[in-house]
């Protein structure tokens, strides 16, 4: 038990002070021995840290006695050496303030020293791993020491000597081993990877490694070799990475003429993707490089880096600003121009081997062509995506939207230009896959357009290509100077591009389905209904569309709508109603057609998991007018439901048609509940009043209401369609009249019906025969086909019908009141 807790204990400050004097004497011995060990350590950096260990205050491990035992030594009575250092009269020495633990003084290492120790530890493991031919471990050691070196550069520590020694050791290990000696595939793969990385690192640190080879002993004695930029000669650059000075793109831009071209380009490449990177300075510096580029290779390399940097600058924006977008487009034009001029010497392809050193031109292949790794069409796709995003964010009612839409032609020109380039330079085994991407983009810009608009785009595109440096050789359809882009040419373009995608069914089902839908949409819009229907039915798209991605589902829904409109234009009312019915009854028609606003799509983005919001929206100029869809659907319902309702109410047994929100039957039932009916104002009102006129047998008034609907002008050849629709209204009004008023006639004159509905006698006879056969009406034509003779049956009058309905309602309400 401690003496402090004893009742008889008396604190003696004198004895305590004597004990502390003994302790402090032993501590001074430990401190002095520890300081001698510290002085013997080597330093491997330019900036040597002053030891701060003398300022460390460690509590004594010996137990203090007295009521102030819990205080720090300097606050106790008598202090750590028998006196309080805060008293003015006290002669306090700072050496007495440090105290050690029983096992000796604890040495605190700086971050530099810890990083150095880790590098030394890895350096010591290289020999043992090499002796065992463990290249997987060697590769891990190389990756670890590279991470440490990167950390040293980030902290502005310079280049450690131990890193240079490690590089030289790795190089010796690689040189001493032959790949033929390695039988294991995994080890051989690790060896090849290590060899390539070491080769690159030695190249980057050539000056430092060379100095080490010449005088290894100096690296053990001298603290540091200066760090260089990408391990090249620092004297060639106006700045250095060594010490505490960082890379500055502004400095590069201001001293561009003093720098080596590829050194500067490497600095720009290394700065991409890093935090706090100034994209404006990157673009400015790269543009300066483009101005001083002399060889085609330098221009190509600069373009391949400048265009992605422009896209990087707008990655956090809704879309790329117009100025930068046009600059990117001009850069792409410039890149293609250089490649077209030097097509026999330089080619940019996605399938070229990787070049670790950009300053070294790739070796020429067997055809004498130097292949440069890059993806031209990826940049074209990105440019197209930024164009689409800008259209989605611009107000569709503004003049800015129309101005922006004019840039679509330049995108289309680039796509065709890329197609011609890829046809010439891409190897046969990769051509189909790459051209499929090109054709997808090309079709996206023309499949929904009318023949007139496609002709304009094709004519302008091929005219610009003929004026440029591009080759006009193509194995696909192209527009010659003597040809005209008429409807036949447009159909040939769409068919050839779509068929190319359709043929890839075994390799790429996605391309097959998109090609089928592109072709179906175009034919339904510009040609005929029957061929489009045949293409759609012959494919299996409808079976699997529910499991497809959002973009394909939207395209499929658009095709279905266009098929319905094509059937309406062909006068196939029943088929049009069947095709449109599945989509028009959907309350989210705007969303499933991709015609919602971008803001609304962002709010509902959780509906389609994993789909980019831009895929759920189409630019405004690609929309199918929803009012037109509703008008066509309700007009079809008008022509089908009104005669059907008249037949049902007249007592004829007919199959009951399902009632939907937009069906004319539901609209009529809703209108009957209204107390006051004003003149028609909306689209729905005009259809309603046309239906009521048909029920009365007034076909002229019904046609007049339909003609007042303005959306008919959106259909091609709208006058012909209205005339065709008028004839349909006449016939269906005749049917409605016969069903409604047959109970009042024993026979009706055919000639009278012909005059009443302004139809030929042959058509009236055909309608009468159709009613008798299809609806099983108890009637017949006389021998001379002059009258329709009705047989009296168990038909009820209108008054009886109302009475029966009233009885049913009374019975229903009586039972309800009893409950």
UniProtKB/Swiss-Prot annotation:
SMART domains: PINT. One of its GO terms (biological process) is formation of cytoplasmic translation initiation complex. It holds the Pfam family PCI. Disulfide bonds: none annotated. One of its GO terms (molecular function) is RNA binding. Component of the eukaryotic translation initiation factor 3 (eIF-3) complex, which is involved in protein synthesis of a specialized repertoire of mRNAs and, together with other initiation factors, stimulates binding of mRNA and methionyl-tRNAi to the 40S ribosome. The eIF-3 complex specifically targets and initiates translation of a subset of mRNAs involved in cell proliferation. This is Eukaryotic translation initiation factor 3 subunit C. The gene is NIP1.
